[in-house]
């Protein structure tokens, strides 16, 4: 054999060995699920409403996510991170399409966000059954808290019934005998009124469901005036709440009935309502004046960046990202099973303080009584005036069997 033939043979052998090494390397990376670059990056698909009248809510949530990422140095659990924002347009079919894209095409580790309960119902099965972690920043519909629960779902907000249960208990304790109640006609609206009725034992004079997205409440207010209820309880989030409270005041309804709310008068609506909403009472699991270090930092930085108080939507969006940061850091990876195991243990750092988790992976938390007041600068905000429930659990956890 000539020298040239020997060298050629050696080169062929080396090429074959190199090729085999490459294939073995690719095979190992395939078995591990990703290349090192991808494995070291946590990818979050954040779904919220960024367009239309409800876009004001989604933009606050987006602002809060960005502040959270600033606070974590652009990383989650010490790993490089990427957040993909998507606009669900407040449409269930759009939300479902986006959820499938995030899971199948973008291959996110976590799908988070979601304001509306009907949208959460649309994406819950497609996401959780793909073995992707789904973390709610707001929506907490009752079907997925009970028999329809799934181990890949975690709430960083509340179960829909929890907060209005606080208002029902408060009015019961105040000796109120009868109430007129109202909410939009969708899953969350039904849950809110169910929660209120669970703890209020007096007479329900009327249970009214309005159209989701409704802006004109003159007909409802006229009927309410004729009923002359001593108390009125409403759930009208976002722009619906702004219009309802303005029309309530313009119609002089304060002389007819005392107004009580949940998720209606907050950091979304107060910049528009200003002192119109002074004195309105609500229940909530969060308030900008909660006295803990994380909340103070978040509220201060949000106000500095955006010139207004954050809403509870923003606080929950911030808490969601801090929960992911905590879960990835403790688990050492963005593996869904590892992250949910960390979150299920509780002790999650949030603007509400360390958060405990129920067996259905919804929070166990306080429900506060709040009043709209003016701060030292004359800006309308909410102030905690009492605690209705301590370490409050939702009503559906016992039905949840993972």
Placement of each model-derived feature along the sequence:
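Periplasmic-binding protein-like
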Residues: 102, 106-115, 135-137, 178-183, ...
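Beta-alpha junction/loop-to-helix N-cap segments that form part of ligand/metal-binding clefts
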Residues: 56-61, 71, 75-144, 156, ...
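Extracytoplasmic "Venus flytrap"
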Residues: 45-64, 86-93, 115-116, 182-190, ...
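Venus flytrap/periplasmic-binding-protein-like
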Residues: 88, 135, 142, 212-213, ...
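Sec/Tat signal peptide C-region and signal peptidase I cleavage site
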Residues: 34-39
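Extracellular/periplasmic Venus flytrap/periplasmic-binding protein
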Residues: 97, 142-145, 150-251, 286-297
């Amino acid at each position: 054999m000539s020298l040239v033939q020997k060298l050629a043979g050696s080169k062929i052998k080396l090429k074959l060995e190199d090729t085999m090494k490459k294939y073995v390397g690719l095979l190992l990376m395939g078995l591990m699920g990703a290349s090192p670059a991808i494995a070291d990056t946590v990818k979050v698909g954040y779904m919220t409403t960024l367009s239309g009248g409800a876009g004001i809510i989604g933009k606050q949530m987006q602002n809060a996510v960005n502040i959270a990422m600033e606070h974590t140095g652009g990383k989650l659990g010490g790993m490089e991170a990427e957040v993909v924002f998507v606009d669900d347009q407040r449409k269930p079919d759009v939300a479902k399409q986006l959820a499938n894209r995030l899971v199948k095409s973008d291959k996110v580790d976590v799908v988070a966000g979601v304001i509306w309960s009907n949208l959460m119902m649309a994406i819950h099965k497609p996401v959780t059954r793909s073995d992707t972690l789904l973390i709610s920043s707001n929506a907490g519909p009752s079907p997925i808290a009970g028999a329809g629960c799934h181990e890949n779902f975690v709430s960083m907000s509340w179960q829909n019934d929890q907060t209005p249960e606080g208002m029902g208990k408060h009015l019961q304790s105040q000796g109120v005998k009868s109430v007129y109640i109202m909410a939009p006609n969708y899953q969350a609206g039904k849950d809110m009124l169910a929660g209120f009725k669970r703890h209020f034992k007096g007479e329900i004079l009327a249970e009214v469901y309005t159209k989701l997205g409704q802006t004109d409440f003159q007909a409802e207010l006229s009927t309410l005036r004729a009923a002359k209820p001593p108390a009125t309880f409403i759930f009208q989030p976002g722009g619906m709440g702004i219009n309802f409270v303005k029309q309530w005041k313009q119609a002089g309804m304060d002389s007819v009935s005392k107004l009580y709310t949940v998720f209606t008068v907050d950091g979304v609506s107060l910049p528009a309502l200003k002192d119109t909403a002074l004195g309105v009472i609500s229940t909530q699991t969060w308030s900008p004046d909660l006295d803990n270090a994380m909340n103070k930092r978040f509220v201060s930085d949000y106000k500095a960046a955006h010139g207004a108080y954050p809403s509870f939507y923003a606080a929950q969006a911030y808490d969601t990202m801090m929960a992911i940061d905590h879960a990835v850091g403790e688990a050492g990876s963005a593996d869904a099973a590892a992250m949910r195991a960390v979150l299920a243990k509780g002790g999650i750092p949030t603007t509400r303080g360390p958060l405990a988790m129920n067996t259905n992976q919804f929070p166990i938390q306080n429900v506060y009584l709040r009043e709209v007041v003016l701060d030292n600068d004359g800006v309308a905000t909410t102030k905690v005036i009492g605690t209705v429930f301590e370490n409050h659990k939702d009503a559906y956890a016992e039905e949840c069997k993972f």
